[in-house]
Amino acid sequence: MKTFTTYSFLLATACLVILGGCKKVTKAVDGTGNPTNPGPISKYTNPTTASATCDYDVSDTALTNHGWTKTFDDEFTGDLSNWGAVTGGLIKEQQCYEPANAQIVNGVLQITAKQESVTGPKSVGNDTTASFNYTSGWLISKQTFVANATTPKVRIVARIKVASGYGLTSYFWTYGSGAWPTQGEIDNVEVQGDNTKMYATDYSYGPLVNQNDVSGGIEYNPVTEDLSACYHVYTMEWTQSALNSYLDGKLVEAKTKGGQIGNLFGKAQQISLSLPVGGEFYNNLNIANIQGGTMYVDYVKVFTSN
């Protein structure tokens, strides 16, 4: 749900930016932040609390037996060659994204937000430098995925233990490369680190640059378990008429509202994993309360079906 003015340029360039990272400096964290960070927008909360299963895992065999074909599978046992790493800041967020903050450790992708003073690009694709008090990681898949006439159903799946901690938001989402939101964006999972028994889903689309025509697309889904305590499997099933969100194999939300889901059909998406510090979910952010944290990703898989 990253809907702000310069985002179209950032999304168009982010997947190409794999730079040398931000330069550390010795200046102490000064405790100041961005006082204009907006809080969550008006929201719809699912009246049903979803049942979550700690350390749940998906069965590839069960899916293939039901007509699904696996087209992408990264279990993070090797390197990050399937992904591009973003470098730089992002509007309304506090961190400098660095490739070094996304690492594979013992077969798990770890995206870590750290409190440290650095200088780096003010924003993605902007050579102007700025000072930051935090670093974090943002990866974007090199491969694209699309629900279209050939593959009308797409399931994008990730097994994640979200980050815990004030000021952090674990994101698992997709976007279409190009001027936002003309190629669409699908927010599979958004979890605030200080509210880890709830996750949000959303989507964006509009034919005009920087104009999201989706009305009321965001939904907050309460769950029975702390999503940061263990791994959970998040699935977004994308069809021409709906965005169906599954948690640990169970349908949580069938999103048909917003008026624009049909316009996402045929627009190729890249998968994105990120852990921003601050941003749109935190109003009047108190920097002193941010301690950092890690988002753990066991795997990312994509399945298609006719």
Where are the language model's segments positioned?
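Bacterial N-terminal signal peptides that target proteins for export
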Residues: 1-10
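Intrinsically disordered, low-complexity serine/threonine-rich segments
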Residues: 11-12, 24
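C-terminal motif of bacterial Sec signal peptides marking the signal peptidase cleavage site
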Residues: 18-21
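GH16 jelly-roll
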Residues: 24-25, 29-306
